[in-house]
Design a protein with these regions (language model features):
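Gly/Ser-rich oxyanion-binding loop with an adjacent helix/lid
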Residues: 1-42
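C-terminal nucleotide
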Residues: 38-184
């Protein structure tokens, strides 16, 4: 029988992202190891589906282009390192507001690297920005929610699971396209 840490190391060889599945919260460190993080908050996530079509540019090609040509890529990498330290503190402190602010800021900075690449491109669409605005609007009304995005147009909503039902109800009134609840 292998320990979770040993299984993580084996999984890492097959897929960089698969090893995160062994922990509720995990961080990939610079030395290649994966660290389990602790937080007393119970997070939920839903996806506001903007577009289900295949991306025009793959994540791998996009990242290579950003690394090679984006004038803001190095600044984003430094920001990500700083955000990593801040995020670990916020998780330890169970500070959902800080977690959400870091999440949004870093996602926007990452997407900003695409517009300074040559040739420039964007995964985000007008509807992506509309989805982000919905999250901001609900937050201004007292809902505890923040957005994030990976390399694509869809917007993920981070929230506390205890708020899921009322948040889903409110988002459904504003977002008329598909919503996916990500269950644990």
């Amino acid at each position: 029988n292998k320990t979770t840490k040993e299984l993580v190391e084996i999984a890492k060889e097959g897929s960089g992202s698969s090893c995160r599945s062994f922990y509720k919260l995990a961080a990939w460190l610079e030395d290649g190891s994966v660290e389990e993080l602790e937080c007393s908050l119970d997070f939920g996530m839903m996806v506001l589906v903007v577009n289900e079509d295949r991306k025009k540019i793959s994540s791998r090609v996009a990242m290579e282009r950003c690394v090679q040509t984006s004038t803001t890529f190095d600044a984003w990498v430094e920001k990500a390192k700083s955000d990593f330290v801040l995020m670990k503190e916020a998780l330890k402190e169970a500070d959902f507001k800080k977690i959400g602010e870091i999440t949004e800021s870093n996602a926007l900075a990452m997407h900003g690297t695409t517009s300074t690449s040559t040739p420039s491109f964007s995964f985000l669409t007008e509807e992506s920005y509309m989805a982000m605005d919905i999250v901001k609007e609900l937050r201004s009304k007292g809902y505890r929610c923040y957005f994030t995005m990976d390399a694509g147009p869809n917007v993920k909503v981070l929230y506390l699971r205890e708020d899921q039902d009322k948040l889903y109800e409110e988002i459904s009134k504003l977002w008329k396209k598909k919503i996916i609840l990500c269950m644990e």
